[in-house]
A protein has these predicted regions:
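Hydrophobic core
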Residues: 12-18
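PEST-like low-complexity, intrinsically disordered acidic/proline/serine-rich tracts
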Residues: 3-5, 9, 20-266
Length: 266
C-alpha cells in the first residue's frame, strides 16, 4: 500500500503551492538494498510496474523541477515569446490560482512527485499517472503520426526500440498546459522526445528533450530517474469541482496571497 497519501484539500494546496513537502517521503523499497537492486535480474525491455520519482538521484546543474532544496537551478533557453509567457505563468502561480481539472500533459505528469504505472501490451505501452488520474498511450506497432493529428493535452506518442533504449516521440500538444509546475510554457509546435533505459532492477532513467522553436531558442534536456515501487498501488486523486471550490475558498481567497484575482496572459 502506498505510504505517501494526500489526505485533504489542504494537503493538495501544499503540493501545488509548496511542492517540496512530499519529496522527502520517497524511499527505498522495504527490504531491498542498493546492492540487491543492482544484482537482481531484470529485462531491459520491461518497464511494467509502478514507478516513483527519485529526487535525491536527479543530476545537479541542469533544469530540474524536483530539486527544490534551495539550489539555484538554471532556466531553459527561452525564446522572447517563451520568456514572456513564463513570466506571465509565474505570476499566475505565485497568485495561488493554479488548481483546475485540465490534464497535466505528459511532461508535467513525469515531473510531479507522484507515481505512475506502466502497463505493457503487444502493440502499445499504457501509462496511468496517479495525480488527476491521467492516461497516456505510447504506440509501438510501427505506425506513423496521423496527417490530421488533433491537438491534445497529452499529445500523441509513438515508441520504438534502439537496442535496449526505448525512444518515444510525442507531438500534437495543444499548448494549454505547463511543462513543469514552475510554469515553463509550450506551444502547439512542441516535440517531446524521451529515451528510456532500465539501469537496474529498480531504476529507470529517462532523458527528455524538448524542441519548441516558438517558446525556446534551442532544444533542451532534462534527465530524470525513477524507482520501482513493487509493493505500492496507485491512490485515487481525481480532480473534482468540489475540490476546486474548497481549494479556492481556503487558498485563493486568503488575505495573505497577493494578486488572487490575477489572470494569466493569453
Amino acid at each position: 500500500m502506498r505510504n505517501c497519501v494526500m489526505g485533504s484539500i489542504a494537503a493538495l494546496a501544499t503540493v501545488l503551492v509548496f511542492p517540496a513537502v512530499p519529496f522527502a517521503q520517497a524511499a527505498q523499497q522495504p527490504g531491498m538494498t542498493k546492492a540487491d537492486a543492482q544484482s537482481k535480474a531484470f529485462d531491459a525491455h520491461d518497464f511494467a510496474g509502478i514507478w516513483n520519482p527519485a529526487p535525491r538521484m536527479q543530476p545537479k546543474g541542469e533544469v530540474n523541477p524536483l530539486d527544490l532544496g534551495g539550489h539555484p537551478n538554471p532556466l531553459p533557453p527561452f525564446a522572447p515569446a517563451g520568456q514572456a509567457k513564463y513570466e506571465s505563468n509565474k505570476k499566475f502561480i505565485d497568485a495561488g490560482a493554479v488548481l483546475d481539472c485540465d490534464p497535466y500533459g505528459t511532461a508535467r505528469n513525469f515531473f510531479t512527485p507522484r507515481p505512475f504505472e506502466n502497463i505493457q501490451a503487444r502493440d502499445r505501452l499504457l501509462q496511468h499517472f496517479e495525480y488527476y488520474d491521467n492516461w497516456r498511450e505510447i504506440w509501438m506497432d510501427g505506425r506513423n503520426f496521423p496527417d490530421d493529428l488533433e491537438p491534445d493535452y497529452m499529445g500523441y506518442s509513438i515508441g520504438r526500440w534502439e537496442g535496449e533504449t526505448f525512444v518515444v516521440d510525442s507531438r500534437g500538444y495543444n499548448g494549454k498546459q505547463f511543462l513543469t509546475w514552475q510554469g515553463f510554457p509550450l506551444s502547439e509546435s512542441m516535440r517531446q522526445t524521451e529515451r528510456w533505459q532500465r539501469m537496474d532492477h529498480d531504476t529507470l532513467k529517462i532523458v527528455f528533450t524538448f524542441e519548441d522553436p516558438k517558446m525556446y531558442s534551442k532544444p533542451w534536456t532534462i534527465t530524470y530517474f525513477y524507482k520501482l515501487m513493487s509493493n505500492w498501488v496507485l491512490d485515487a486523486h481525481p480532480c473534482t469541482l468540489a475540490a476546486i471550490k474548497e481549494y479556492d475558498e481556503r487558498i485563493n481567497h486568503a488575505d495573505h496571497l497577493p494578486g488572487r484575482d490575477y489572470k494569466p496572459e493569453k
